[in-house]
From Swiss-Prot:
It comes from the Bacteria. Pathway: Pyrimidine metabolism; UMP biosynthesis via de novo pathway; orotate from (S)-dihydroorotate (quinone route): step 1/1. Pfam families: DHO_dh. Belongs to the dihydroorotate dehydrogenase family. Type 2 subfamily. This is Dihydroorotate dehydrogenase (quinone). Catalyzes the conversion of dihydroorotate to orotate with quinone as electron acceptor. It comes from Aeromonas salmonicida (strain A449).
Amino acid sequence: MLYPLARHFLFKFNPEQAHDLSIKYLPRLLGTPLDCFFRHSLPKRPVTVMGLYFANPVGLAAGLDKDGECIDAFGAMGFGFIEVGTVTPKPQSGNDKPRLFRVIPAEGIINRMGFNNKGVDHLVAQVKKAKYQGVIGINIGKNKDTPIEQGKDDYLICMDKVYDHAGYIAVNISSPNTPGLRSLQYGDALDELLAALKVRQQELAAQYKKYVPLAVKIAPDLSLDEINQVAASLIKNGIDGVIATNTTLDREMIYDMPHAGEAGGLSGRPLQHKSTEVIRQLAKALDGALPIIGVGGIDSAMAAREKLAAGASLVQIYSGFIYKGPSLVKEIVTHI
């Protein structure tokens, strides 16, 4: 009820300013009378996926809390899991501003942030401080100045540092905003990366005496053949889950709207059906071999149900959350 007022206020700022304000002040509201603004007590909808217990199947997608500075505040909203990041070995500022745009008529967002983050050490410190009892996924990527041929090393560095603190680790090879990154989704490059990650996962599992699942995040802009190849590689390399999908480069749904010409990845409602079709095709190719986390344009319980019906076991929200607010979590969990 209060969120439309808050959104009206936040939308007076440019999108990145609004995001930064939210990340700065949300944690400060916890434990004050104002935390009733977003705190929700939700019905239990427990599921077990990748060997992990989730109080409900609705998660926060990576990108909103890149540095893990709002975990407890988002946890109070009722999320069954929270994915922080994308984080890189070294801090980096990301791409030049402006780099975040609202496509309000379509309830979409275009971003070309470029993995701006404070580095993996800072993120781990934030995760260690968090009191949230749900599953925390940590999304890892490569630094922009790391040559793509050496990208594997960045993922392994991050994996080493986050392993003992993550519920699961998400491997981001599908952001359109880091040059060359999406090339890691194809053929030998994908196999080589996944094989190296799997070996390191097994080494770390022995070291820490616990198994932390690996999930790979893929793009929506893949052909059917490419989806089938990705699925085969995930199975072959023993990956535990797949997150479908990241943002799209496609502008067909918003071609005549403000900011349609901006470079970057499009998320929100315009991505909804495209990502669902990828999930459907991926589920067919995987044939139950590993679970899918469905993300892309979920802005209602019905949209979440469509993702689950297409083959997802869990769902994540981001852009829908920006437009609808914390009540979207309650709506989905209650009516899913």
